[in-house]
From Swiss-Prot:
Residues annotated as domain Helicase ATP-binding: 24-414
Binding annotation for ATP: 37-44
Family classification: Belongs to the UvrB family.
Subcellular location: Cytoplasm
Superkingdom of the organism of origin: Bacteria
HAMAP family found in the cross-reference section: UvrB
GO molecular function: ATP binding; ATP hydrolysis activity; DNA binding; excinuclease ABC activity
Name under which the protein is recorded: UvrABC system protein B
Organism: Wolbachia sp. subsp. Brugia malayi (strain TRS)
Length: 645
């Protein structure tokens, strides 16, 4: 099936030449290209046109979940008849398995999985395996181990109307795919049998399931049903049932893996005993033997991914199978906001290796567990397909790959120029930013404010709230879907002011924004670097009446370069508008939120529980993020006790 771009717009501004240049580069087999596209110039629309023109599948990597969600929404709008999928980390809370030698504390892996995102991940994998017209929008989590596509595909079951099956064998096959049987509980990853009817709820459907109608051993009919009501949606001729776990393999392969696991265990035990490390030896022997027993009995075990070397026939040090293994050969890779995303990809491996080493050294895991990891940067480089890096401020790596050549997209189709930048003294910045925000809100626009610290963001939000202003703030403890919901509320005028630290830079797409305020702009550093300032100023470039205010008592080198680059772009944009008689027009973008989280509130007997648990959960997430696993585990236990009251 071809990619069908659905839009009322035609490429304009710099878009036509950018699309032509990028398509030509792909056709000329250029491995790397850079699109230097300013905020609001329609980079996503350019990507969509490149995909449609080349008719090639695509993987788009974003550096955070909020930006990935925006890209997913936009791509679904552009390609409603094709498979647009979403692949980010499915953890609302994640505490990896860890050992702290200082306190002799072992912390078991613990996580809270977001079921909706888990379903979307399965859907992405299945679309890549079943159809060519697929676009996957992913976060950097796509470089983490996922399971072998060969093993995954080999375990699929395809059924057609008229097929004859042995019912008991088929039910066993479903169990081998990690589907669970329950006549009462029917949700993703479950199946049930009632008389001559078998219902199967695939892992990659949210509210639909399949129904097999049997006459004897023959499949008389296959239906797609509403998973809640059981009502038939439509009749279908054929289905493919994919496994309910990525880390799955045939029973024969699994049994073959047992012997080399035992051999590695014996080698490691010999090492520990030679070093007189009796505790470590006993710990490893007990744990590994238990895992082997579970794998033989049930086909899986807790932490089975740590045995991936043997399950997938890998050699020591081989790159783990990831989402990249599932991609078609002619896929196009778009790295959005590449100046942030590329360094993120490079940083993932080191943190994982440090944690694993402690587990292995102290007898909690075999050395082969090292192979359950994210890709190293060099591995990612070697396997990535033709790549287009996209950023308003490309990094050194991207430009080095293209010999400093890039396709520039500075002219916006809307005629909007980069915003006027005003520098004001930082001394009275809080008083002034409140006043400027009130003026902007009266004009019918919303406000973005960026601070240097989370504490300052919270205090400013509290101060504005006391002045009866509708305000919220973004920070790293807020989940991906909650962030999306906050941005949705800002656009729909449920709130007027959004305050954040480092979350208001790349990719936040809010045409209703009439003011971007940067507090302490003269504090030189990562958050106030030239790149950060240009990106933050760019948040005001989707509205013809928007401004940017930088609060500073002096003009730093970063400020000077950012202001000069912004002015250079403004002059070029104004010249184009005059030459082509273009009047600046604010972007009109539908307000949608298809990823809005479905919130279920648990009523407890103590009125304070909701707020208390919310506060504790934020602390738990912060400790886990800072690798303070012992503290995170303590707080998790407290939350559990409160919820049981």
């Amino acid at each position: 099936m071809k990619f069908q771009l659905v839009t009322h717009f035609q490429p304009a501004g710099d878009q036509p030449q950018a699309i032509d240049s990028l398509v030509a580069g792909l056709n000329d087999n250029k491995r790397d290209q850079v699109l230097l596209g300013v905020t609001g110039s329609g980079k996503t629309f350019t990507m969509a046109n490149v995909i449609a023109r080349t008719n090639r599948p695509a993987l788009i990597i974003a550096h955070n979940k909020t930006l990935a969600a925006q890209l997913y929404e936009e791509m679904k709008g552009f390609f409603p008849h094709n498979a647009v999928e979403y692949f980010i980390s499915y953890y609302d809370y994640y505490q990896p398995e860890a050992y702290l030698p200082q306190t002799d504390t072992y912390i078991e892996k613990d996580s809270v999985i977001n079921e909706r995102i888990d379903m979307l991940r399965y859907s992405a994998v299945c679309s890549l395996l079943e159809r060519r017209d697929t676009i996957v929008v992913a976060s950097v989590s796509c470089i983490y181990g996922l399971g072998s596509p060969e093993s995954y595909l080999s375990m699929t079951i395809t059924l057609s109307t008229g097929d004859r099956i042995r019912i008991n064998d088929f039910l066993n096959d479903l169990a081998n795919l990690q589907y669970k049987r329950s006549d009462i509980r029917f949700e993703r990853g479950y199946f049930r049998m009632r008389g001559d009817v078998i219902d199967i709820f695939p892992a990659y459907y949210e509210d639909k399931a399949w129904r097999l109608l049997l006459i004897g051993n023959e499949i008389e009919g296959i239906s797609e049903i509403n998973a809640i009501t059981g009502n038939i949606i439509k009749c279908i001729d054929k289905i493919t049932i994919f496994p309910n776990s990525y880390h799955i393999t045939s029973r024969e392969t699994l049994l073959r893996a047992v012997q080399p696991i035992r051999e590695e265990l014996n080698e490691r035990l010999d090492y520990y005993y030679s070093q007189n490390k009796i505790v470590e030896a006993q710990r490893l022997e007990q744990r590994t033997n238990f895992d082997i027993e579970m794998m033989v009995a049930t086909g899986t075990c807790k932490g089975i991914e740590n045995y991936s070397r043997y399950l997938y026939g890998m050699e020591a040090g081989d790159a783990p199978p990831t989402l990249f293994e599932y991609l078609p050969e002619d896929v196009i890779l778009f790295v959005d906001e590449s100046h942030v995303t590329v360094p993120q990809i490079g940083a993932m491996y080191n943190g994982n290796e440090s944690r694993k080493k402690k587990l292995i050294d102290h007898g909690f895991r075999l050395p082969s567990a090292f192979d359950n990891r994210p890709l190293k940067f060099k591995e990612w480089e070697s396997m990535r397909p033709q790549t287009i890096y996209i950023s308003a401020t490309p990094g050194k790596y991207e430009l080095a790959r293209t010999n400093n050549l890039f396709v520039e997209q500075v002219i916006r189709p809307t005629g909007i120029t980069d915003p006027i930048c005003i520098v004001k003294p930082a001394e009275a910045q809080v008083y002034d930013v409140v006043h400027e925000a009130q003026v902007t809100i009266k004009r019918g626009f919303c406000v973005l404010i960026t601070t240097l610290t989370k504490k300052m963001a919270e205090k400013l939000a509290e101060h504005m709230s006391e002045l009866n202003m509708k305000v919220s703030y973004l920070h790293s403890d807020i989940s991906a879907l909650e962030r999306i919901d906050i941005v949705y509320k800002l656009r729909s005028k449920e709130i007027d002011v959004l305050i954040g630290v480092n979350l208001l830079r790349e990719g936040l797409d809010i045409p209703e924004c009439g003011l971007v305020a940067i507090l302490d702009a003269d504090k030189e550093g990562f958050l106030r670097s030239e790149t950060s300032l240009i990106q933050t100023i760019g948040r005001a470039a989707r509205n013809a009446e928007s401004r940017a205010i930088l609060y500073a008592d002096k003009v730093t080198g970063s400020m000077d370069r950012a202001l000069k680059e912004t002015e250079r772009r403004r002059k070029k944009q104004k010249k184009y508008s005059v030459l082509h008689n273009v009047l600046p027009k604010t972007i009109i973008k539908p307000i949608s939120n298809t990823l809005k989280e479905k919130v279920v509130v648990k009523v407890t007997t103590i009125g304070m529980n909701k707020d208390t648990v919310s506060s504790l959960r934020k602390q738990m997430l912060a400790h886990a993020k800072n690798l303070e696993f012992e503290e995170a585990a303590k707080i998790k236990n407290i939350i559990g006790r409160i919820n049981n009251l």
